Design a protein with these regions (language model features):
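Alpha-helical packing segments of well-folded alpha/beta enzyme cores
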Residues: 39-42, 46-53, 82-85, 130, ...
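Short aromatic-cysteine micro-motif
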Residues: 130-142, 246-279, 309-338
């Protein structure tokens, strides 16, 4: 099976193994004027990416483990939620006329308020169905969406906002948004619940040796501020543009932007390490009001995915990636907003 075939013909449940020789990869944003076959290919690619991501869960139990911060549902919700979204949006648009599983389409419809970092969800953890039931539901919706794409008259011409098939495009992009949601939740799980997917690319090229004292210019790039000249920027997406867009992307606006400075590189782990080691997390002046509230609430002193690898105060860290724990990669961009 070729790499493209592996993405076009995904395993329908995470219990079915994908081709170990294939690499996970995303197709470009779908051109909605490109016809049924392109729409089907994009859907199957989207589905495959979700299956590949969830194949990293090492056991059924991992689907039901609550995140340590308790501000999100367990991963079983995010495995079913995008699927439920397809059904509900197709019902609203008229692509289908009856639910697949009305109980699931209520249970998995709504997530949590991602803006409330202190909104703990303490109850209701016994409401989630068995994983086999969720997999059967996913299988049924997968076949339904394929059938709609192959047969519905609205896909005989380019998909626009006025087309019932716009709901399909919305479903594709909604599912892709949740790849980030789920990947972060997987990254937050204890390692015992996670494994690297067989189809994951061999991307790690950094030295295996641990280095606790990074040197600027050797272990991470020397950064500098670059001058950006004043300019006029145009914002907004034309309504006739042949790709899906969310409502806030449309309209037209122009703004005059004054000159400013921007760093040449993203802030690396090595550069951020200096901030951490200097006690930046304990200094109120560096934080917004809500950011400081979060820092105090969590009592954090370094980024979430930096793993302490020594006694308190030693500033010895490893790096937690999505599926494993590795030596700190000082040249990689710092991830600090979780």
């Amino acid at each position: 099976m070729s790499n493209q075939q592996a993405l076009r013909e995904p395993p329908q449940t995470a219990t079915q193994s994908a081709d170990a020789s294939s690499d996970a990869g995303s197709l470009p944003l779908l051109n909605l004027a490109s016809g049924r076959e392109a729409v089907l290919e994009y859907f199957e690619n989207t589905w495959a990416l979700t299956e590949q991501l969830f194949s990293s869960l090492a056991s059924d139990e991992a689907y039901y483990v609550r995140p340590y911060h308790k501000t999100r549902h367990p991963l079983v919700f995010y495995y079913a939620h995008p699927v439920c979204f397809y059904v509900n949006k197709m019902l609203v648009s008229g692509l289908i006329d009856k639910p697949v599983n009305q109980e699931f389409e209520l249970l998995f419809e709504t997530g949590v308020d991602e803006m409330n970092w202190d909104d703990l969800h303490e109850g209701g953890q016994d409401v989630w169905p068995a994983l086999d039931q969720v997999r059967q539901y996913r299988d049924a919706v997968y076949e339904l969406v394929r059938q709609v794409i192959r047969t519905h008259p609205s896909l005989e011409k380019p998909i626009t906002m006025a087309s019932p098939a716009w709901s399909l495009a919305m479903g594709f992009e909604h599912e892709r948004i949740h790849l980030e949601t789920s990947s972060v939740l997987i990254r937050e799980l204890p390692l015992e619940y996670v494994k690297e997917p067989d189809v994951w690319p061999d991307w790690l090229t950094a030295p295996a040796a641990q280095n606790y004292e990074p040197v600027e210019g050797a272990h991470y790039p020397t950064n500098e501020l670059l001058e950006v000249a004043p300019t006029r920027v145009s914002l907004g997406k034309p309504h006739g543009w042949p790709t899906f867009g969310w409502d806030n992307e449309y309209g037209q606006d122009q703004r005059e932007v004054n000159s400013f400075q921007a760093s040449k590189f993203l802030i690396s782990n090595g550069e951020y390490f200096r901030f951490v080691k200097a006690g930046g997390y304990e200094q109120r002046r560096y934080w917004s009001e809500s950011g400081w509230g979060w820092r105090q609430f969590r009592n954090v002193k370094w980024p979430t995915f930096w793993v302490q690898d020594g006694p308190a105060g030693s500033h010895r860290y490893k790096l937690r990636t999505t599926f494993s724990e590795i030596p700190m990669q000082w040249s990689w961009p710092a991830v600090v907003n979780y």
